[in-house]
Amino acid sequence: MADNRTFTMIKPDAVENGHIGGILDQITASGFRIVALKLTQMTQRDAETFYAVHNERPFFGELVEFMTRGPIVAAILEKDNAVEDFRTLIGATNPEDAAEGTIRKKYAKSIGENAVHGSDSDENAQIEGAFHFAGREMF
């Protein structure tokens, strides 16, 4: 995945609260093109693997439990400067600190239930996208 692609997940809290459409609308209205999209459910093993970087952190167990409690929407997005622009669009991890109009300000409940994941680097965007999508699933 080049620097014009990023990976995102709409997390279980936002799916449960019916925010898929609103979030996808905001993403596309911000100039991103969706090149891969799926509704899926992470298993415990999936979540533990995906978030392995956090496995020594005190919140790891809660994170895995949260990410497996319901379906997620995984997507690969395309736009120039995709990773940085998407991080700006979603806002700060804690919705209380997020700028007005950002996805997390609009849809997140708390720092733990913060509606969306966005890759933090081009390298991680490639790794995370490949975790959820086979090459034939990207257009």
Curated annotation (Swiss-Prot):
One cellular component (GO) term of this entry: cytoplasm
Family statement drawn from the similarity comment of this UniProt entry: Belongs to the NDK family.
Binding site for ATP: K11, F59, R87, T93, R104, N114
Keyword Transport applies: no
Name of one Pfam family that matches: NDK
CDD domains noted in UniProt: NDPk_I
Stored InterPro entries: NDK-like_dom, NDK-like_dom_sf, Nucleoside_diP_kinase
Catalytic activity: a 2'-deoxyribonucleoside 5'-diphosphate + ATP = a 2'-deoxyribonucleoside 5'-triphosphate + ADP; a ribonucleoside 5'-diphosphate + ATP = a ribonucleoside 5'-triphosphate + ADP
Subcellular location: Cytoplasm
Active site: H117 (pros-phosphohistidine intermediate)
Keyword Transferase among record annotations: yes
EC number: 2.7.4.6
Upper classification of the organism: Bacteria, Pseudomonadati, Bacteroidota, Flavobacteriia, Flavobacteriales
Protein species of origin: Christiangramia forsetii (strain DSM 17595 / CGMCC 1.15422 / KT0803) (Gramella forsetii)
GO terms (BP aspect): CTP biosynthetic process; GTP biosynthetic process; UTP biosynthetic process
GO molecular function per UniProt: ATP binding; metal ion binding; nucleoside diphosphate kinase activity
UniProt xrefs under Gene3D superfamilies: Nucleoside diphosphate kinase-like domain
Protein name per Swiss-Prot or TrEMBL: Nucleoside diphosphate kinase
PANTHER family documented for this protein: NUCLEOSIDE DIPHOSPHATE KINASE, NUCLEOSIDE DIPHOSPHATE KINASE DDB_G0292928-RELATED
Cofactor(s) for this UniProt protein: Mg(2+)
Quaternary assembly: Homotetramer.
Task performed by this protein: Major role in the synthesis of nucleoside triphosphates other than ATP. The ATP gamma phosphate is transferred to the NDP beta phosphate via a ping-pong mechanism, using a phosphorylated active-site intermediate.
Keywords, sorted A to Z: ATP-binding, Cytoplasm, Kinase, Magnesium, Metal-binding, Nucleotide metabolism, Nucleotide-binding, Phosphoprotein, Transferase
